From Swiss-Prot:
The record marks R85, D86 as: Cleavage. Residues 30-378 are lumenal. Keywords: Developmental protein, Disulfide bond, Glycoprotein, Glycosyltransferase, Golgi apparatus, Manganese, Membrane, Metal-binding, Signal-anchor, Transferase, Transmembrane, Transmembrane helix. Its EC number is 2.4.1.222. Disulfide bonds join C167-C178, C196-C259, C363-C372. The keyword Glycosyltransferase applies. GO terms for cellular component: Golgi membrane. This is Beta-1,3-N-acetylglucosaminyltransferase lunatic fringe. The keyword Membrane applies. Substrate binds at R128, D200. It comes from Rattus norvegicus (Rat). The active site is at D289. Residues 85-108 are annotated as: Disordered.
Length: 378
């Protein structure tokens, strides 16, 4: 009798244990709430250790952005969008589809719709500007404006679009911001659709530039160029005489050139027009191109569209493929790691006769130019 009861009790216990196991394995864990999803996703972006990616990472952003606690779903999506933008391939490249073909034009553009500002200084008029007038500026003088700090009769004979800025000739952040302020005001007065800034050591491929800008409506907020840093710049913003706060943002380096749509430029007015650009630059105590990024990204919340079609002397220009020169918007020359830095291109001119390679590039793009030798340009 006792043995029979013991067996029944044992079978009942085993059955109960099996039922519990079935319930536990069949019932999934509770779904995390949206805020918890946000925290987990941001931790996965930051890495298992919770640290931000290193400088060499494609998703290099301000570490404080990735590891701080997220308190709302909207905040999470804002941070995640920024991190994904850093991890994605450079858009421009951003103006191109995955198959390598240009995006369909958003509007029809002509050269008269674009305002190209070339920043220079008196001492470089002969050494740099003469080369630009001989090459790319010769194609569209009417859309190109020279912003300089000194009068020059010889320069005035080249073009009527010379703007004397009354700014210092020094290469200081104040002098650079002074010239940018004049550039901005002249663009607004012009009524043109696009503002593009370049330096006097840039070659501008006008066909590629128009093709790129036509991909975006000029009435929308568009800020396109190439950053020289692999993460947002961190600055100190002066709020009042005794108060400052940290601020971080992306900016397109002026040495590669950048473009801004008229729709966005008009929104920049409170911080850029009528001399306000200088006072805005003093708030962060950084040069002109950084100040543009500060106004656009930090104050207006418009993200930089990063394009691999802009190039400065700060990068290794030897890596620009000759077969893709016709697609590049800007090129440059100078020194890189104590070596001569220019696009590697075979052409009718030797390196000694054409150290910048701008003449060879121009003949490659425009072989019908009268002074280009009638030889095969590789």
């Amino acid at each position: 009798m006792l043995q029979r009861c013991g067996r029944r009790l044992l079978l009942a216990l085993v059955g109960a244990l099996l039922a519990c196991l079935l319930v536990l394995t069949a019932d999934p864990p509770p779904t995390p709430v949206p805020a918890e999803r946000g925290r987990r996703a941001l931790r996965s972006l930051a890495g298992s250790s919770g640290a931000a990616p290193g400088p060499g990472s494609r998703a290099a952003v301000d570490p404080g952005v990735l590891v701080r606690e997220v308190h709302s779903l909207s905040e999470y999506f804002s941070l995640l969008t920024r991190a994904r933008r850093d991890a994605d391939p450079p858009p421009g490249v951003a103006s191109r589809q995955g198959d390598g073909h240009p995006r369909p034009p958003a509007e029809v553009l002509s050269p008269r719709d674009v305002f190209i500002a070339v920043k220079t200084t008196r001492k470089f008029h002969r050494a740099r500007l003469d080369l630009l007038f001989e090459t790319w500026i010769s194609r569209h003088k009417e859309m190109t404006f020279i912003f300089t700090d000194g009068e020059d009769e010889a320069l005035a004979k080249h073009t009527g679009n010379v703007v004397l800025t009354n700014c210092s000739a020094a290469h200081s952040r104040q002098a650079l911001s002074c010239k940018m302020a004049v550039e901005y005001d002249r663009f607004i007065e012009s009524g043109k659709k696009w503002f593009c800034h370049v330096d006097d050591d840039n070659y501008v491929n006008l066909r590629a530039l128009l093709r790129l800008l036509a991909s975006y409506p000029h009435t929308q907020d568009v800020y396109i160029g190439k950053p020289s840093l692999d993460r947002p710049i961190q600055a100190t913003e002066r709020i009042s005489e005794h108060r400052v706060r940290p601020v971080h943002f992306w900016f397109a380096t002026g040495g590669a050139g950048f473009c801004i749509s008229r729709g966005l430029a008009l929104k920049m007015g409170p911080w850029a027009s009528g001399g306000h650009f200088m006072s805005t630059a003093e708030r962060i105590r950084l040069p002109d191109d950084c100040t543009i990024g500060y106004i656009v990204e930090a104050l207006l919340g418009v993200p930089l569209i990063r394009s691999g079609l802009f190039h400065s002397h700060l990068e290794n220009l030897q890596q620009v493929p000759t077969t893709e020169l016709h697609e590049q918007v800007t090129l440059s020359y100078g020194m890189f790691e104590n070596k001569r830095n220019a696009v590697h291109i075979k052409g009718p001119f030797s390196v000694e006769a054409d150290p910048s390679r701008f003449r060879s590039i121009h003949c490659h793009l425009y072989p019908d130019t009268p002074w280009c030798p009638r030889t095969a340009i590789l």
